[in-house]
């Protein structure tokens, strides 16, 4: 017999309250003799599900920060809370409830006045838009 599915409440947010951030891998591209990863920075507004996508040839911190700024400029504003799926660009270390954010992300958050918030480990239901 199949194990019963766990029930979840649908996430409800207000306009401008929250967005969800992640990287997506889109295979590789050939540039000259080099084969490079094609990465998409993805930010989704939780309330409207409006999506922002920007492609990069890596998933380094500079691209991660640039993706945030580009999304904020495209939308003409900054969500109050940004959810992260414990990706290394955002969370350097996590032990229980103790979270060490990447200092560069904290600097960006302080400048743009948003709250970075990681979702619980292995709880994809907490971040249902950009997964």
Language model: regions and residue ranges:
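Substrate-binding beta-hairpin/strand module that engages nucleic acids
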Residues: 80-84, 89
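Short small-residue beta-strand/loop micro-motif enriched in glycine and branched aliphatics
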Residues: 49-54, 90
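Short, solvent-exposed loop/turn segments at secondary-structure boundaries
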Residues: 55-56, 93-98
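Two-metal-ion acidic nuclease core segments, chiefly of the RNase H-like superfamily
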Residues: 98-116
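Mobile-element integrase/transposase regions
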Residues: 1-51, 59-63, 67
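Active-site beta-loop-alpha junctions of metal-dependent nucleic acid enzymes
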Residues: 53-81
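RNase H-like two-metal-ion nuclease catalytic core shared by retroviral integrases
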Residues: 84-85, 95-96, 114-131
């Amino acid at each position: 017999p199949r194990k019963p599915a766990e029930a979840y409440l649908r996430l409800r947010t207000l306009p401008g309250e929250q967005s969800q951030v992640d990287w997506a891998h889109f295979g590789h591209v050939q540039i000259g003799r080099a084969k490079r990863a094609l990465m998409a920075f993805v930010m989704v507004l939780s309330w409207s599900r409006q999506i922002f996508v920007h492609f990069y040839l890596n998933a380094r911190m500079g691209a991660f920060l640039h993706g945030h700024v580009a999304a904020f400029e495209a939308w003409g504003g900054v969500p109050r809370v940004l959810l992260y799926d414990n990706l290394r660009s955002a969370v350097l270390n996590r032990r229980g409830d103790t979270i060490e954010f990447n200092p560069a992300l904290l600097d960006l958050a302080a400048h743009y006045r948003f709250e970075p918030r990681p979702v619980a480990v292995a709880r994809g239901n907490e971040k249902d838009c950009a997964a």
